[in-house]
Regions:
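Conserved helicase RecA-like core
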Residues: 1-234
Length: 234
């Protein structure tokens, strides 16, 4: 609402992951179409030259991971002079991923006159410290949720000596349609993809060691129904 169609960056959104940056950019793009407002996601794993060309063509909102945002700022391909809004999404996730120094470096170079919105599932001390240091008289809005499980989700716990065999029995008897399986580690994802593949299941893995192009290909196959099972780290 307060972003104009002037061809300079007016809002910065920090996200912990490439996937979230892309998702946020897509949603902002839908909203901004009628106002001729462009949003651009920037992240590692994509050629920086392509991002620089898009930035030079003129965008109003940039969404990105802290490391890549900082890279552009140091190259002067992202200029902070006209930033009116800063959004920090999933701040505690960025803290866990070791981005807090990059976040602080970006925040301290922004114009003093701006609005900052910081979203976080938890408020650990380093995040609170950032709010006190770089926000003016911030208001804390806390949402207390008593139900920790979505009401339409049924949960079942299975005790089994062989997880893969137990999973295959579930796939054969109980589960129809698309399925997402979460594993604790990237190695666990790769091993389960191989184990299910040797048993004839159409499964693909998704984790941080894949390039962005590989991730995009996996997601397209899953959405199109060419793969039944998506195995991922969270």
């Amino acid at each position: 609402q307060n972003i104009t169609d002037h061809r300079h960056i007016q809002a910065l959104v920090m996200t912990p992951t490439r996937e979230l940056a892309i998702q946020v950019a897509e949603e902002i793009g839908k909203i901004g179409q009628t106002k001729r407002v462009k949003a651009l996601p920037v992240y590692g794993g994509q050629p920086i030259d392509r991002q620089i060309r898009s930035l030079r063509s003129g965008v109003q909102i940039v969404i990105g991971t802290p490391g890549r945002l900082l890279d552009h700022i140091r190259r002067a391909t992202i200029k902070l002079d006209n930033i009116k809004f800063l959004v920090v999404d999933e701040a505690d996730e960025m803290l866990d991923m070791g981005f807090v120094e990059d976040m602080e470096e970006i925040m301290k170079n922004l114009p003093a006159e701006r609005q900052t919105l910081l979203f976080s599932a938890t408020m650990p001390r380093p995040i609170l410290s950032l709010t006190k240091k770089y926000m003016k008289a911030p208001k804390l809005v806390a949402i207390h949720k008593e139900i920790v499980t979505a009401p339409l989700v049924d949960q079942f716990y299975y005790e089994t000596k062989d997880k893969v065999d137990g999973l295959c029995r579930l796939l054969d008897v109980e589960i129809n349609g698309k399925l997402i399986i979460f594993c604790r580690t990237k190695k666990g994802v790769d091993e389960l993809v191989i184990a299910l593949g040797t048993r004839g299941y159409l499964a693909e893995g998704l984790h941080g060691d894949l390039s962005q192009n590989q991730r995009d290909r996996v997601m397209k196959k899953f959405r199109a129904g060419r793969v039944d099972i998506l195995i991922a780290t969270d």
